[in-house]
């Protein structure tokens, strides 16, 4: 499910748009105030994705500019970094519905760098945690402190030893579906 707009909620519940809009924002505020901020533990998947990418390239090659240069990049470009905790083996054994991610911590940054990833991991992941990532050099800073395992997405989605960061990739799949299909525009706030 990609989310419900205020207009759709107003039709479903039978209230006007303003009432549905206020209800959605009150729900969002309540979720934010009562979220679980304890450290993630055991097995965690981490990854980053960029939103507000470069605009569409010009048709003619001579009119195109190099968007890799900082002065040509979109000023609103941001990196969303997610850390998702798996259910433990014991939790899965007790309840067969405990599959996928147990909790998620999401951070908005300017870029996916070693300093940013290091500070995020320090704030939200226990030191004994096992972190699964892709082979981005930004996550190399985690090697001395955490049990870091990587998968090379250029060659495979799941390594032969079972390492995958599919929970983080799943989050971004749903996030982008919400971004393009429901919200259409996101402010950086």
Regions found by a protein language model. Give the residues of each.
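Residue-level recognition of single "structural anchor" positions
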Residues: 1-189
């Amino acid at each position: 499910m990609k989310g419900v707009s205020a207009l759709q909620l107003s039709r479903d519940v039978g209230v006007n748009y303003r009432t549905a809009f206020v209800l959605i924002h009150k729900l969002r505020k309540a979720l934010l105030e009562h979220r679980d901020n304890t450290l993630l533990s055991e097995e965690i998947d981490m990854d980053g994705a960029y939103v507000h990418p470069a605009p569409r390239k010009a048709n003619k090659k001579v009119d195109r500019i190099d968007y890799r240069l900082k002065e040509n990049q979109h000023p609103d470009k941001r990196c969303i970094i997610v850390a998702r905790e798996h259910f433990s083996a014991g939790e899965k054994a007790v309840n067969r519905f405990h599959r996928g991610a147990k909790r998620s911590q999401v951070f908005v940054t300017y870029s996916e760098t070693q300093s940013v990833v290091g500070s995020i991991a320090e704030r939200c992941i226990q030191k004994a945690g096992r972190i699964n990532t892709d082979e981005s050099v930004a996550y190399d800073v985690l090697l001395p402190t955490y049990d870091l395992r990587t998968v090379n997405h250029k060659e495979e989605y799941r390594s032969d030893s079972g390492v995958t960061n599919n929970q983080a990739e799943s989050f971004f799949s749903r996030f982008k579906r919400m971004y393009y299909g429901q919200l259409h525009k996101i402010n950086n706030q």
